[in-house]
Regions:
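An amphipathic, aromatic/His-enriched active-site/gating alpha helix that lines ligand/cofactor pockets
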Residues: 58-87
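Short S/T/G/P-rich N-terminal loop/turn motif that feeds into the first structured element of a domain
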Residues: 1-48, 62-63, 84-124
Length: 124
C-alpha cells in the first residue's frame, strides 16, 4: 500500500478556521474515495495537524488529491498554513504505520513545500 503523511502547520486562528472548513469537505470526499484503505487524523497542538492515509495505488491517491474538495483546499493552502513548516511524505509499506513512525518519517524528509507541485496550485 502507498501511505501519505501530511503535517500542516496552521498560520493563525483564521487559518485554523479555514482548515476546519476545507477539512470537513475533504473528509466527505475521502469517505467516498475508491482505493482508500485506511485514514487517520492527529494533532500535536492546535496549530500542528497531521493526516495519514493508505491507498491501494498511487493512481487512487492522486484521484483523491487532484480533484474536488481536496484540490480546492490545496489551492487555498497559503491562507491556511505556514508553507515553510508544512510537508508531506509518502512511502510503500505492508502495514499501516503508527503515528510515531509517520511523524518520524515526515520529520526526516527533505520535502520542501515551496518547491512542490502543490505550491503551484496555491498560486493559481
Amino acid at each position: 500500500m502507498l501511505v501519505s503523511c501530511t503535517h500542516i502547520r496552521i498560520k493563525n486562528i483564521l487559518g485554523f478556521l479555514r482548515f476546519l472548513f476545507y477539512n470537513f469537505r475533504s473528509f466527505q470526499q475521502l469517505k467516498k474515495s475508491s482505493g482508500l484503505i485506511q485514514k487517520s487524523f492527529h494533532s500535536t497542538s492546535l496549530f500542528d495537524l497531521w493526516t495519514l492515509s493508505a491507498w491501494e495505488s498511487k493512481k487512487a491517491m492522486l484521484a483523491y488529491i487532484n480533484n474536488g474538495a481536496h484540490l480546492d483546499a490545496m489551492k487555498n493552502f497559503r491562507g491556511i498554513a505556514d508553507t515553510f513548516k508544512s510537508k508531506v511524505v509518502r512511502w510503500e509499506t505492508e502495514v499501516f504505520p503508527t503515528w510515531d513512525e509517520a511523524i518520524r518519517r515526515n520529520n526526516e524528509s527533505d520535502y520542501e513545500y515551496e518547491k512542490s507541485a502543490y505550491a503551484k496550485l496555491s498560486k493559481e
